[in-house]
A protein has these predicted regions:
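Sec-dependent N-terminal signal peptides
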Residues: 2-14
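Asparagine-centered strand-capping/turn motif at beta-strand->loop junctions
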Residues: 58-60, 64-75, 83
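A eukaryote-biased signal for long
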Residues: 194-255
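Low-complexity, acidic Ser/Thr/Pro/Gly-rich terminal tails and inter-domain linkers that flank the onset
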Residues: 17-61, 69
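Short beta-strand elements
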Residues: 160-191
């Protein structure tokens, strides 16, 4: 779920943050609190404590507190940052297969460009050196930034929101694409050699520029995971991993 970023230098390039304008969400029961609010600092401390990695401190001017005041836990949040002339980041963060991370009724979390933060333990992600920094490249000197929550998915699977930025299709792909690839692997098992199957997976995994289609986007990381399993544990482990993907109950996403 977390968008892992190495941003110490990155944010330094951006200079001082501009004002973050928080647009209240049209989703009933969702409360947003931005850095301009006198309550913001206390809420941040309540959620993650006072020990703040440098990268998080730099991200806080673009961060918003999201409190769930509905009666149902939230399984996915689409937070969108925009500038007057462009979308800076459309972060459709989902916890479909991690029920322990659902945002419970009454709970508040931080929606920041690096990811959704729920507690202090998650801050260790900032110490890791891996990066998905394309998610924040447009935050370099962005001017005035607007943030809102465009859509959520509740624990029941119910999608709620305007869906102006394609979150439903992206979440649908996150659920279905791994299952489709796992099914294809098991179907090929009987009619193709393992070398042919691996070659096919390598072709899927080798894509460097993400395609526009969300289903194709979500196929790439699954192919890489399956390849890693095969390379470390062998053919039977590959098929076992594919089967385990299909054994997981399907999250009931619906409009």
């Amino acid at each position: 779920m977390m968008r892992i970023l190495s941003l110490l230098v990155f944010f330094a390039l951006g200079g001082p943050a501009q004002q973050l304008d928080v647009v209240l969400s049209a989703i009933q029961g969702l409360e947003l609190v931005g850095p301009q609010s006198p309550d913001f600092e206390a809420l941040v401390t309540q959620i993650i404590g006072t020990d703040r990695p440098v990268a998080l401190v730099a991200a806080l001017p673009y961060t918003v507190v999201v409190r769930n005041r509905t009666s149902e836990a939230i399984a996915a949040i689409d937070t969108v940052w925009t500038a007057p002339d462009r979308i800076l980041l459309n972060a459709a963060d989902a916890m479909f297969d991690q029920a322990f991370l659902y945002v419970k009724p009454g709970q508040a979390v931080l929606a920041s460009p690096p990811g959704i933060l729920q507690n202090q333990r998650q801050l260790r992600i900032f110490a890791y050196g891996t990066a998905d920094d394309h998610r924040l490249k447009n935050f370099q000197d962005p001017g005035n930034v607007t943030v809102t929550v465009d859509a959520v998915v509740f624990e029941s699977g119910q999608f709620v929101g305007a869906d102006r930025y394609g979150a439903f299709e992206r979440w649908q792909a996150q659920i279905q694409a791994p299952r489709d690839l796992a099914t294809a692997v098991l179907q090929r098992r009987g009619g193709q050699s393992i070398s042919d199957i691996v070659s096919w997976l390598e072709g899927l995994a080798a894509v460097r520029r993400p395609p526009a289609d969300p289903h194709a986007q979500e196929t790439i990381p699954t192919a890489r995971v399956l390849l890693a399993v095969y390379r470390s544990k062998g053919e039977e482990a590959l098929y076992s991993r594919a089967k385990s993907i299909l054994d997981v109950p399907v999250f009931p996403l619906r409009r």
